[in-house]
A protein has these predicted regions:
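N-terminal cap/lid segment of alpha/beta-hydrolase-fold proteins
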Residues: 1-35
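Short beta-strand element of the alpha/beta-hydrolase
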Residues: 34-45
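The serine-hydrolase catalytic nucleophile loop
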Residues: 46-59, 73, 255
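Catalytic nucleophile-loop/oxyanion-hole region of alpha/beta-hydrolase
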Residues: 50, 76-111, 115, 281-288
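Conserved alpha/beta-hydrolase
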Residues: 60-80
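Alpha/beta-hydrolase-fold enzymes
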Residues: 127-206
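Short beta-strand/loop motif that positions the catalytic acidic residue
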Residues: 237, 243-245
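Conserved alpha/beta-hydrolase "acid-adjacent" motif
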Residues: 250-256
Length: 298
């Protein structure tokens, strides 16, 4: 991951869903305090926290002259909220909506020039937010989780049975929450072990500079997955959207047939020969970034 040390950092907090959420706004080092910059709101994936997997993109966007905000969802990273490490996609979308309002309120941000950026699970949230905010300049989603049912069915049956069993137990059992690994080495138990997930996490740790990563997710979180299907709302997107799908993605299978069936003229689709985590790293990262910068400069 590329360093963010050349960007000016502005820390802040906002309240969402009863929790105090941590946010970081990155602006170009040479930006004036009275300058209003075009901005990007970054929405991370399933087990994401600030800087993990996103810092190379964030740095590049700041270098291109944008103000870029990352944030932690309630119960994750530097944000407050209990219980910890839970995921509910509908709640997360509401939190992201509040984060968007927070970004618009920042003095160095041009509120009428905001682009949403989402990766993996966050890509699904961007679809949902884009349908609610026709005033936004645009949206970018990469390796998006558009169909939770397809992602669920792509899980090996024995693994799926264990995930659902633990999720159900966590949902209904009184007492302490049950946690499962968010990421795991290939073949080991966790919510993500395919497509080089473990190796990607180890690389992402370098960007956290000793901050650490709590590699757990509440087991009941997996029960939401098959019911979360943002592709069904893709037809309602009315702002320019760049969608980069990976044809070899086995974590969040790219449902290109469903996207084509929707046929939304506002959505530009680029398919790349890659797995779920390839776009974050060389050799694919520069090409993926180039597509996104071209879209942002349109």
């Amino acid at each position: 991951n590329i360093s963010l040390e050349r960007a000016r950092t502005i820390k802040s907090t906002f309240m969402a869903e009863g929790a105090l959420c941590a946010a970081t706004l990155y602006v170009p080092q040479d930006a004036r305090p009275d300058q209003e910059l075009p901005a990007i709101l970054m929405l991370g994936g399933w087990g994401s926290i600030q800087r993990a997997m996103t810092s190379s993109f964030t740095h590049s966007f700041v270098e291109a002259g944008f103000a870029v905000m990352e944030f932690d969802y309630p119960g994750w990273g530097d944000s407050g909220g209990f219980p910890r490490q839970g995921i509910n996609p509908w709640r997360r979308t509401r939190v992201a909506d509040t984060a968007l309002a927070h970004l618009k309120s920042q003095s160095m941000v041009a509120a009428h020039q905001i682009t949403l950026w989402g990766t993996s699970f966050g890509g699904g949230h961007v679809v949902d937010l884009a349908t609610q905010h026709p005033e936004l300049k645009g949206a970018i989603i990469q390796v998006p989780m558009l169909d939770g049912l397809a992602a669920t069915l792509a899980t090996p049956p024995a693994r799926l049975l264990r995930l659902v069993s633990l999720g159900t137990l966590d949902q209904f059992k009184p007492g302490a929450q049950i946690y499962i690994p968010t990421l795991a080495p290939e073949g080991e138990f966790g919510t993500m072990d395919r497509d080089g997930a473990w190796d990607a996490m180890e690389v992402a740790m370098d960007a956290l500079k000793g901050r650490g990563y709590d590699n757990r997710v509440a087991a009941k979180s997996v029960l939401t997955m098959p019911f979360y299907r943002p592709w069904l709302r893709l037809k309602h997107v009315k702002i320019p959207m760049l969608m980069i799908g990976a044809t070899g993605d086995t974590v969040a299978p790219f449902v290109s047939d469903k996207v084509r069936r929707v046929g939304n003229p506002h959505v530009q689709v680029i398919e790349i020969d890659a797995n779920h985590f390839d776009p974050y790293f060389d050799p694919l990262f520069p090409g993926v970034l180039a597509h996104q910068l071209k879209f942002l400069r349109r």
